[in-house]
Each structure stands twice: as C-alpha cells, then as structure tokens.
C-alpha cells in the first residue's frame, strides 16, 4: 500500500514513513519536513468509523483534562475513502515505554495517581457509541473467552486458565456486575504508557475503550505492571497508594482485584494461543505471552486473602482477620478423637492444585495430601461434578451410562484377569468388602496382614490394621488375624526380600499345621503407616506363588499407592511383577470426592453372587463415576504419572545429596511421588521421633505441608498432588536444609 497516496488529504508532507505493529489498523510513524512526528492509522473496515470517531472525541477531551500528554487527533477530521476505508492522524508522544524502564516504587505510585486522575476525569463522561461497544477485552465479557480455551494445547497450562475463569464466574462475576460503570481506557498495559524522568508522561492507544467498572482498569494496569516483578504484593501496594490519593476503592472492588488481574492474564494467553493457530498473526500478539504465563504461575502461589489485605489498609479498611472461633467451635461440636495436624492448627479457606490458602493469608505448598491426586479444585472435576449433579444422581439399581463407561476405563488399566469391579464410598469400605468377599470365596476366616499396615477405619479395617491394633490403646491382633513381618530393607530383620518371604511362608506353614487356613493376605505395595516403606524387592515375587498354591487370595491395597503415584507403574503391585486376586482402591480415585472400589476376578465376583444382594447406596452413583472418569482423563492428558516419575527422581537425587551432609537423614525412600525421609539420631541411630515432629512443624512455619509416620513416627512423609513440580521440590529442600542447619537433634 502506498501510504503517501492515502495521506494526500492531510496537510503533511512525509519525509519518513516507518511501519508499526498493530492488529486492528495499519499503523505508521510519519516524520514531516519540519521534523514533527505523527502516528497515521488506516482502517479498512468501514463499520469501525463511528467508534473510532468516538475514540477521537474521548482523546481530545482527555487532552484538556489530564496533567500528562494524551495521544490525540493531530487533524480535526478523519478522512474516509470511496471504498469505505478511512484514516486518522494522531499526535506522536515522546518517551520510553513503561515496559522498557527500570521499575521503582515511586514510578508505580505515580502510575496510580495518573490512573486515579484518569478515572476522575471520566467519571461523568458519556458517549453512547462507547457504551454500546462490546468486545472481548472488556472484563465484563471475560467468560466469552471460555469458548477459545481449547486453543491452549498444553493441558497443564489450560487448567490454570480454566481455574481462574471458574473462580471469576463463581465468586466475582455477580459482584462486578453490580458496580457502577464509566468509560475506561481498558488497556493500560506497559506498551501504552510512556515514561520520562521516572514519571508517567503519556498514555496512548485508546483502541479498547469500554464502559465498565473502574476496578477493571486497575486490574489491567496491574496485570501488566506485575510482569517480571519479584514481589507482586509490594508493586500492587505502591500503585494502590498512589491511586488512593485521589480515588477510593470500595471493599467489593478490592475483593475483586485478585481474580480480575488473573482473568486479564487469562484472556491475553488465550488470545495468543488462538492467534498461534493462524499464520497471519502479528508478533505483537505474542509480546507478553511468556511473562503472562509466568505471572499466572506465580499468582497461584499468592493467597487471595493476603492480596486483599495488602490493599485494605490503603483505603482505610481493616485487614481481614482469621476466624478465631473456628477452633473453639470444633471442640464444642466434634470429638477430640478427630486429630489436627500441627501443634498450631491451620484454618484453610481455599486451594488450587498443589497450593492451599489459609485464613491468615499464608499460602501453603501441599507436599502431603495425596487425596487431591490431580490437584486441589481442578476445574475439569468441578465442571463435570456440577454438570452431572444438574442431570442425574441415582444408584446402581438403575441403568446409566456413567457407570459402565467408567468401569470400562478403569478395568482397562488392569490385566484381563481382573475384570469385575464393586463400587463403594471409600478405601476403608473397599478393604472391608475385600475381606468379606475373600472369606466368602474361600470359606475361610483367618487373615494375613503386614506389621504396621493400615487398611481403613471400619471395624474390619481396624481388625486387619497392625498400625491400629499394635498402636496406642491397641489390644493386639484379633485371633483370626496374623501379622507378618514388614519386609523392609532399612533397619530390617532379614537380608533380602526373598528371606522375608521365606520367613512369612514359615509362619503360614505353622498356622497350617495348627489347622488354620488363611483366606487372604492383604498388604500395600508401599507401607504408608509403616514409614513409606516399599516392600523389599523379591518379597512378593517369592511369596505370591506360595499363596496361590495354598489358595490364599492376595489383596493389593492400592488406596495410597495406585493411579500412577509411583511413576514407573500405574499400580504399585506392578513394580514387583505380581498379579493380585483383588485390588482395593480409594483416596485418589475421586480426587477428594468419596469413592472407593474393589477390582477382582470373574470367578470371585460370581461366587459373591449368592442371593445375599450387595448394594451400596451411594457407591457407583453417576456423579462419582463422572468424577472418577475425569480423574483418569486428567492423569493421562496432563502426563501426571510421568511427572510423578520425573519429579520423584529429582527429589530422590536432592534428598540423597542432603543425606550425605546431614546424617540425621537415615534413609531416603522414593517411588515416584510416594516419598519418605527417615530421621534418626546420628549417634545412636535410634528413631528421632521428637526431632521429626519439630521438623514437620518448622516446615509448616515455612508454609510447607508434610507429616510424619511410621511405628516410631519419625519418618517425614510426602505424598503431594501429582502436579507437584521440580520447582516445588526446590522450595521444599531450600526450607528443609535451612531447618536442618538450625535445628540440632
């Protein structure tokens, strides 16, 4: 296009024409004979004429109101051409882009002042064309972007955007729509703000003006100002203090900012991802994409309450205080038998993926809770649960697709021999049912378990859990239960897994000689309550053939170990190349939704069909099935099993290096993201129970959640959500090493 031809209507003789980036118009930097500089903008879409005229009018108005330069028309009229296209000439503003200058708190403060003056100037400005202009960059329309989320091809990225849009829809949308509206610039990003001498000197590009609550303008300005900033809270406070010199924010507006900032970033990365699917997109579309993703990652680490509290005092509101009554009310209404983690318990208010947010504003890295297997509050699970609850929730006495669809998916992760599944509401119920089925199938009662094992909170679960009957207030094993030694390599009693298996076989033989024929042997592939102890290699390989020869059923309790947590395999028993007769499922199966399952062989399931109907009121309901199905999809789509393997190896490498430096780390246990660090007295080699408790609580004080386990409660255990990253591992070890350095045993 010959720019000089379409510029003939303007009293300017260009001597230099430089093409600029743009996505709604063709933009040029023009220098005339006298050295004056202008911005020439050419529009091909004739339907934009009235809106651009309204934009010109607004810029002219602001140029008379603001103490800084405003990009404005350099020629009183826009020129329209015979084909309907049109152009305009704007003033050129000198200065550096905000993105290119060194950040300072003083500059952020001044930016806040300028935004406040801008809002003050526009409080009563009305223009029907602007008010009618509806577009995707108006944050009131942010949920329209959900239609384009699929353009984000990486599911681990897409979930973050879906999460924040979901949070906005649930907790912010309704409040935002009740706020008064006014004309806004709506794109105060760091490319549209000019700086000179550490002061804001100009604002350009009014192409996204809209009619919306003023807090949207602040959210957009902050979304870009916070890019690449080490401490977003400090930057936000500096800008807010400047804004507060001339404008106030209501408590509602302050509460909205956290989600609105995230939403603007989400719209930006969605737009970039969509643009990437076309070959004609300008590089301008991608200019802040990586920074926006980085800030979204960082945003997850910021507690919404902390962010709100960083603003409230600036606008003369008290900080949100933790609810001090919740602990007293818990004691009043609940039994003390329900224990709390940590010497000073945490009052949690919300969560996201591997982060949990407390009422005091702290964000906790969750390295402990294995139930939210694919992450806390995963938006896909929330969405499918909500949709199914609005459609059908019944029981297994009726036919419905969700039951069979999930069963097919689940059983696809087992060998063909394991082809039937029973659904219940928890791992405890599943273990209980497994024993009931085993005793019926074998017509035997006696059971074999492992020392320090745990299999649930039912009466039967306690009977078969050495962790309980050999623990505090325990009365030892019932007469129909025989505990076998836990086959552990560290501080073990046998030299190998095979030796442990031979020892177990000897114990069973003695039972047999006494006329006691066991029905089943139940164990976890990794003993959680035993101290995160992987069964010694060779144990199951040598024991299982013997069990089969005696028609003793082998039950693998995968409640904590299964669904890809060990990384190398989907189920824990697969690590040992053995085949169980039954598999107990629970905890991660529904990512926090109560669901459990028992998988077994056809002949065992058929034998249980003896006229005494099995029925679980809620087991296998459509909501549970849809949620569980989504968990499997997320594990596959987000590559979480592989992430468990890679992140677990990274953890193991750092842990073993640290153990060389700190001998109180007696043993490092790692199978994927099933992790344990046994803490000992380095002199006596005795379990360091008190020390482990101190370490756990000090990690909590550094906002990292772990726990302790094992018969001596001296094993620091970590079983985080499978989205746990290498960066999270680094965060853990940075805190852990500082604590080890300062905490003498």
Regions found by a protein language model. Give the residues of each.
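Active-site acidic catalytic loop and adjacent metal/ATP-binding pocket
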Residues: 24-32, 39-40, 169-216
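A cross-family kinase active-site recognition segment
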Residues: 101-156, 179-181, 445-474
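A conserved alpha-helical element in kinase catalytic cores
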Residues: 42-83, 101-102, 106-109
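An alpha-helical support segment within catalytic cores of ATP-dependent transferases
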Residues: 2-7, 126-127, 143-186, 325-331
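Conserved N-terminal phosphate-binding loop of PLP-dependent enzymes in the Aspartate aminotransferase
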Residues: 315-745
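ATP/Mg2+ or Mg2+-diphosphate-binding catalytic cores
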Residues: 268-326
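Active-site activation/catalytic loop segments of kinase-like enzymes and analogous catalytic loops
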Residues: 215-248, 262-280
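ATP-binding glycine-rich phosphate-binding loop
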Residues: 10-28
């Amino acid at each position: 296009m010959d720019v000089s031809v379409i510029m003939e209507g303007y009293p300017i003789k260009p001597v230099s024409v430089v093409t600029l980036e743009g996505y709604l118009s063709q933009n040029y930097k023009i220098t005339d004979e006298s050295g004056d500089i202008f911005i020439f903008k050419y529009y091909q879409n004739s339907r934009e004429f009235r809106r651009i005229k309204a934009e010109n009018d607004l810029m002219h108005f602001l140029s008379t109101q603001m103490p800084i330069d405003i990009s404005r028309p350099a020629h009183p009229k826009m020129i329209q051409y015979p084909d309907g296209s049109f152009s305009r000439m704007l003033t050129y503003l000198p200065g550096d882009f905000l993105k290119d200058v060194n950040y300072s708190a003083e500059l952020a403060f001044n930016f806040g002042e300028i935004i406040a003056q801008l809002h003050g100037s526009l409080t009563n400005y009305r223009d029907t064309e602007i008010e009618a202009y509806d577009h995707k960059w108006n944050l009131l329309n942010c949920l329209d972007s959900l239609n384009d989320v699929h353009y984000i091809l990486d599911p681990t990225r897409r979930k973050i955007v879906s999460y924040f849009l979901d949070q906005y829809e649930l907790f912010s949308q309704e409040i935002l729509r009740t706020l008064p509206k006014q004309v806004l610039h709506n794109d105060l990003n760091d490319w549209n703000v000019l700086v000179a001498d550490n002061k804001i000197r100009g604002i350009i590009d009014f192409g996204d003006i809209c009619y919306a609550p003023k807090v949207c303008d602040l959210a957009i300005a902050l979304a870009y100002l916070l890019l690449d900033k080490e401490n977003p809270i400090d930057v936000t406070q500096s800008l807010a203090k400047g804004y507060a010199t001339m404008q106030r924010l209501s408590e509602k507006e302050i509460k909205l900012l956290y989600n609105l900032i995230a939403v603007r970033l989400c719209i930006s990365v969605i737009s970039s991802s969509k643009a990437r699917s076309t070959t004609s997109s300008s590089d301008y579309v991608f200019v802040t994409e990586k920074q926006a993703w980085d800030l979204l990652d960082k945003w997850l680490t910021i507690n919404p309450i902390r962010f709100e509290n960083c603003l409230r005092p600036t606008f003369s509101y008290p900080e949100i205080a933790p609810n001090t009554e919740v602990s007293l009310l818990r004691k009043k209404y609940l039994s003390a038998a329900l224990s709390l983690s940590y010497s000073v318990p945490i009052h949690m208010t919300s969560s996201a993926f591997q982060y949990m947010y407390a009422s005091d504003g702290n964000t906790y890295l969750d390295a402990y809770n294995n139930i939210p297997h694919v992450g806390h509050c995963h938006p896909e699970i929330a969405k499918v649960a909500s949709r199914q609850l609005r459609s059908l929730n019944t029981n297994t006495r009726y036919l419905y697709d969700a039951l069979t669809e999930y069963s097919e998916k689940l059983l696809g992760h087992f060998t063909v021999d394991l082809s039937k599944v029973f659904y219940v509401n928890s791992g405890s119920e599943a273990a209980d049912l497994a024993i009931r089925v085993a005793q019926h199938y074998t017509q035997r009662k006696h059971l074999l378990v492992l020392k320090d094992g745990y299999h649930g909170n039912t009466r039967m679960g306690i009977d078969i859990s050495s962790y309980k009957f050999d623990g505090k207030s325990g009365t030892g094993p019932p007469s129909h239960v025989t505990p076998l030694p836990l086959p552990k390599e560290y501080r073990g009693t046998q030299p190998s897994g095979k030796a442990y298996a031979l020892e177990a076989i000897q114990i069973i033989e003695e039972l047999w000689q006494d006329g006691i024929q066991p029905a089943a042997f139940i164990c976890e592939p990794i003993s959680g309550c035993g101290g995160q102890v992987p069964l010694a290699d060779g144990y199951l390989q040598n024991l299982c053939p013997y069990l089969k020869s005696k028609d003793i059923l082998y039950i693998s309790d995968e409640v904590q170990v299964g669904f890809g947590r060990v990384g190398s395999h989907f189920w824990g028993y697969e690590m040992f190349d053995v085949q169980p007769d039954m598999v107990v499922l629970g905890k991660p199966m529904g990512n926090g939704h109560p669901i459990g399952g028992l998988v077994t062989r056809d002949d065992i399931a058929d034998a249980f069909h003896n006229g005494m109907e099995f029925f679980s009121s809620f087991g296998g309901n459509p909501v549970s099935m849809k949620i569980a199905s989504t968990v499997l999809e997320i594990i596959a789509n987000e590559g979480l099993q592989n992430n468990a393997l890679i992140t677990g190896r990274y953890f193991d490498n750092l842990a073993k290096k640290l153990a060389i430096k700190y001998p109180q780390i007696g043993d490092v246990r790692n199978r994927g993201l099933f992790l344990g660090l046994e803490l000992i007295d380095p002199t006596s080699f005795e379990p360091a129970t008190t020390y482990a408790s101190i370490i756990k609580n000090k990690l909590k004080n550094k906002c990292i959640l772990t726990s302790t386990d094992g018969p001596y409660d001296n094993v620091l255990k970590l079983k985080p959500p499978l989205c746990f990253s290498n960066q999270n591992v680094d965060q853990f070890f940075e805190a852990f090493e500082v604590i080890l350095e300062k905490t003498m045993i």
